[in-house]
């Protein structure tokens, strides 16, 4: 789906003209949608910060992240793309983006028994893998059941395999990152 005011309105369940009445600029609209997206992502991935986190919970967080990115493609693209640019003029956006990552990192740190520096490295590595999987799995959805030219060639055969068994794949990824 192409990013547009119309597609954002549809994804947000509002009329196509509503965005024009409520925001001064397109960038202000994009920032508001991205802010809301980060809040929804945080809520979907939330783990109580006072409790021990299991590997299974971290895998579930990763799956929630991926599901959000696939289901809310336009919002996700605003959250992580360049349409808004610098978040600094939008303090609520900056706070919601940081909060989303902070919950992920906090949860990871309660599972891994490492120094803060190692946790930062491992967490951004895991987040990068999960973030990358969103893009790859979105591509798998676009291809759907269409036959690949050479199914054994290229990354799509691997992507399709991962998509068919995402939970097990993420379990291995999380285990590998946490244990190394």
What are these regions (language model features)?
Residues 1-28, 32:
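Helix-turn-helix
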């Amino acid at each position: 789906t192409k990013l547009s005011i119309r597609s954002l309105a549809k994804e947000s369940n509002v009329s196509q003209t509503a965005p024009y009445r409520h925001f001064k600029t397109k960038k202000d609209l994009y920032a508001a949608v991205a802010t809301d997206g980060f809040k929804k992502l945080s809520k979907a991935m939330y783990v109580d910060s006072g409790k021990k986190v299991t590997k299974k919970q971290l895998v579930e967080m990763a799956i929630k992240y991926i599901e959000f990115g696939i289901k809310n493609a336009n919002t996700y693209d605003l959250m992580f793309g360049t349409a808004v640019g610098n978040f600094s003029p939008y303090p609520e956006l900056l706070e919601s983006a940081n909060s989303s990552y902070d919950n992920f990192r906090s949860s990871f740190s309660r599972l891994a028994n490492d120094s803060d520096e190692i946790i930062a490295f491992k967490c951004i590595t895991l987040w990068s893998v999960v973030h990358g999987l969103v893009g790859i799995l979105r591509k798998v959805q676009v291809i759907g059941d269409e036959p690949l030219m050479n199914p054994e060639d290229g990354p799509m055969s691997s992507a399709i395999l991962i998509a068919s068994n995402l939970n097990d794949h993420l379990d291995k990824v999380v285990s590998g990152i946490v244990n190394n």
